[in-house]
C-alpha cells in the first residue's frame, strides 16, 4: 500500500478528486492537519492501525514556500532530503538535528522519472509560516549551506522522521505556493490558490 499524506483541506480535496477519477488502487489518502505534531501523530496513528509490512511507501503532497531565487508559484520540488529549521539540541549535534536522529532524513525518490518540470532539493520544516525574505535568510543561515535548502514547509521532516524510524520509504513532493524572497509574497500565495493550484496538483497527481 502507498500512503499519501496531506495537511490541508485544499490539498486533500484536489488529490482525492484525482485519485477517484484515475481509479487508483491500493492507496490510502490521509489528512493530518498542519504542523509537525499533527503530521507525525496522524501518520503514526495510521501506521499503527495496519499490518507493519502493508505500507511500502509514504508520499507527502502539499505546498511550500520557496527558499531560493527564481522559484515561482506552481513549480514542483522533489525532496532529496529533509531537515528541521527550528531545532537546536546543542553540540555536537548539527543545527536542526534532533539528538539521536540523522542531521537530515533520507528521501526515496528513485520511483520518480525526473525531468525539467521538477527540481530536487532539501526541504526544511518548522512550525512557522514563513512570509518574509528576512525569515528565509535566517533559516538558511542557521542551517549548514551544504543542505541546499530550496523549500520550506511545516510537515515534511516530521513525516520523514516517522518513516525513518519505521523503515518505510518516504518522498515529499511540494508545489511552490509563494516565494518569500520576493516582495509580492502575499499576492503570490493568494493567486496560487485562485489560479495555479489545480493545474500544479494535476502535474503532481500524474506521478502517483
Regions found by a protein language model. Give the residues of each.
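Gly/serine-rich nucleotide phosphate-binding loop at the start of the catalytic core
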Residues: 5-8, 12
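Glycine-rich phosphate- or other oxyanion-binding loops that anchor nucleotides, phosphorylated ligands
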Residues: 13, 17-208
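Extreme N-terminal starter segment of soluble prokaryotic enzymes
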Residues: 1-3
Amino acid at each position: 500500500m502507498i500512503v499519501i499524506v496531506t495537511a490541508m483541506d485544499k490539498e486533500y480535496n484536489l488529490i482525492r478528486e484525482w485519485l477517484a477519477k484515475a481509479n487508483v488502487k491500493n492507496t490510502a489518502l490521509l489528512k493530518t492537519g498542519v504542523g509537525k505534531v499533527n503530521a507525525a501523530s496522524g501518520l503514526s496513528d495510521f501506521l499503527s492501525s495496519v499490518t507493519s509490512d502493508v505500507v511500502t511507501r509514504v508520499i507527502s503532497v502539499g505546498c511550500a514556500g520557496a527558499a531560493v531565487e527564481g522559484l515561482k508559484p506552481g513549480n514542483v520540488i522533489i525532496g532529496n532530503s529533509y531537515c528541521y529549521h527550528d531545532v537546536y539540541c546543542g553540540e555536537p549535534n548539527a543545527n536542526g538535528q534532533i539528538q539521536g536522529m540523522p542531521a537530515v532524513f533520507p528521501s526515496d525518490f528513485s520511483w520518480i522519472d525526473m525531468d525539467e518540470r521538477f527540481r530536487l532539493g532539501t526541504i526544511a520544516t518548522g512550525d512557522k509560516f514563513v512570509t518574509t525574505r528576512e525569515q528565509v535568510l535566517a533559516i538558511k543561515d542557521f542551517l549548514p549551506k551544504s543542505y541546499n535548502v530550496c523549500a520550506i514547509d511545516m510537515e515534511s521532516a516530521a513525516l520523514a522522521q516517522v518513516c525513518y524510524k519505521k523503515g518505510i520509504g518516504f518522498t515529499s513532493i511540494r508545489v511552490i505556493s509563494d516565494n518569500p524572497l520576493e516582495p509580492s509574497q502575499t499576492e503570490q500565495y493568494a493567486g496560487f490558490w485562485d489560479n495555479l493550484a489545480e493545474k500544479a496538483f494535476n502535474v503532481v497527481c500524474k506521478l502517483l
